[in-house]
Amino acid sequence: MSKEILIPTAWEDVTLNEFIELSKLDIDSFDSHIDYYISMLGIFGNDDLNNILEFVKLTDVADIINQMAFMNTPPKNLDHKEVTIKGEVFKLIENMNELTVGEYISIETLIEQGKLDSISSIPAILSVILKPIGEKFDSNLVNARMELFKNELSIEDVLGMSVFFSIGVR
């Protein structure tokens, strides 16, 4: 009986949500490196970890680790100002200095209510500053947008937009 294990092979295969979950893993908190990598497989959608352990050979673990070697190198240095999700184009606000008070308060509130750390706060920030072209800010949409971005944006897209944050204004 053949089993399939979901393994990303490039940063573009890793969603924002998966990246957030990966950032919570501390290799030192695991009994072995194998346990650590098995936990990583769970994050990538391999729900039946006990079944996986039954058929994966030690040599397979080495192959799995090699396939995920891309994680040892940073994602490509992209410069994204917009992304397309499910056929809809979302664009970053053009100038961070032009955030409205309502937008700023929404970001702060989402971060405080969720007790989010710097990585976990990325979807909250994006839910306010990454909008469909021409759309005005609507605080009623932020929770749905956070989930959309966590599940549909690759971490490569997100990090590509981080260039925008590092210079503040375009």
Could you describe each region identified by the protein language model?
Residues M1-R170:
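Charged interaction scaffolds used for protein-protein
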